[in-house]
Amino acid sequence: MNFSGKYQVQSQENFEAFMKAVGLPDELIQKGKDIKGTSEIVQNGKHFKLTITTGSKVVQNEFTLGEECEMETLTGEKVKTVVQLEGDNKLVTTFKGIKSVTELNGDIITSTMTLGDIVFKRISKRI
């Protein structure tokens, strides 16, 4: 399955609790909670380029499935991780105690990030 496309956030659950748990300042949490950000994914075989735009903040990450890479997190921190493909429609990675699963079903991408007992879920639709 090819993940390439541009997606806009439709809904999210537990944004504030998750962002507080990862150390984002309250001011940025309040600014970001109502923004319907976009994600653009360009997939070329096992190589992915991901651009996430939330208001004026843009985060770009590139990775190749199964290879260690450096990624920028939501808080701006750089972490080393490995992204794996599960089945043909799930991208899975773990960093700093956070498990991130991005699942594509048709035109809907569901991103789930779990830290301890806090589960942040974001649903985006292809635009």
UniProtKB/Swiss-Prot annotation:
The modification N-acetylmethionine is found at residue 1. Coiled coil: none annotated. The modification Phosphothreonine is found at residue 51. One of its GO terms (cellular component) is cytosol. SUPFAM superfamilies: Lipocalins. GO terms for biological process: fatty acid transport. InterPro entries: Calycin, Fatty_acid-bd, ILBP. The keyword Phosphoprotein applies. The modification Phosphoserine is found at residues 11, 39, 56, 100. Keywords: Acetylation, Cytoplasm, Lipid-binding, Phosphoprotein, Transport. GO terms for molecular function: fatty acid binding. The modification N6-succinyllysine is found at residues 31, 36, 46, 57, 78, 90, 121. The keyword Phosphoprotein applies. It is found in: Cytoplasm. Belongs to the calycin superfamily. Fatty-acid binding protein (FABP) family. Plays a role in lipoprotein-mediated cholesterol uptake in hepatocytes. Binds cholesterol. Binds free fatty acids and their coenzyme A derivatives, bilirubin, and some other small molecules in the cytoplasm. May be involved in intracellular lipid transport. Forms a beta-barrel structure that accommodates hydrophobic ligands in its interior. This is Fatty acid-binding protein, liver. It comes from Sus scrofa (Pig).
